[in-house]
A protein has these predicted regions:
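Non-heme Fe(II)/2-oxoglutarate
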Residues: 1-83
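Short peripheral tails and domain-boundary helices/loops at the edges of structured domains
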Residues: 167-178
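Catalytic core of non-heme Fe(II) oxygenases with the double-stranded beta-helix
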Residues: 84-153, 157-159, 165-169
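Acidic-enriched, low-complexity/disordered segments with a strong bias for Aspartate over Glutamate
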Residues: 8, 21, 38, 58, ...
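Generic ordered-secondary-structure signal
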Residues: 41-57, 64, 93, 113-121, ...
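Short loop segments at secondary-structure junctions
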Residues: 15-16, 117-121, 178
Length: 178
């Protein structure tokens, strides 16, 4: 796990068993096709609601508690352990050639995550926008099994996918409960 230099963006690799659980959960969500209700102007074409497996929830919440002093120091929210962290909802994204995700943020949560299930080489990059500057995160085949975690008020976007093949990712919002 590491923070991208000079940012609050954490990159971490999921344990193999957690990644396998996420692959299975995303396959079920894609099969069930329960539409995730993102605004049409911000959404890619294929987004489906899904339930994250307990193994993933336990892992990511513990990781956030250990890695981010953000909520403890910057906002004076005193939490010890994961009991106050909660994934409010999650969804699977399926990107095809030409798809993109317009700049947006997640106002009703504290953290956001995007974990990569299946990618192609030279896939559409993920960008963070701050002070009219972009921080690019390249996504490629080696991104599979990795997750980006960051404060949800950071504006982010996915550029148009120019490669053939699908990119499957799972996204979600995390809140801190009182």
């Amino acid at each position: 796990m590491r923070f991208l230099e000079g940012t609050d963006i954490l990159v971490a690799e999921m344990p193999k068993s957690v990644f396998a659980d996420m692959q299975q959960a995303s396959e079920i969500a894609i099969k069930n096709k329960i539409t995730h209700n993102d605004p049409a102007e911000a959404s890619i074409r294929q987004e489906y609601s899904m339930q994250c497996p307990n193994s993933f929830s336990d892992w990511i919440l513990l990781l956030i508690d250990h890695a981010f002093e953000f909520h403890k120091l910057r906002y004076g929210i005193a939490t010890e352990g994961t009991q106050n962290l909660y994934i409010t909802h999650s969804w699977v994204n399926v990107m095809e050639k030409g798809d993109q995700h317009y700049p947006h943020m997640h106002e009703n949560s504290f953290y956001y995550f995007s974990c990569y299930i299946s990618c192609t080489n030279d896939d559409a990059p993920f960008y963070f926008i701050k002070d009219n500057k972009g921080t690019k995160v390249d996504i490629n085949k080696s991104s599979e099994g990795h997750v980006l975690i960051f404060p949800s008020q950071m504006i982010h976007t996915v550029y148009p996918k120019k490669t053939d093949g699908q990119r499957v990712s799972v996204s979600g919002n995390i809140i801190i409960r009182p």
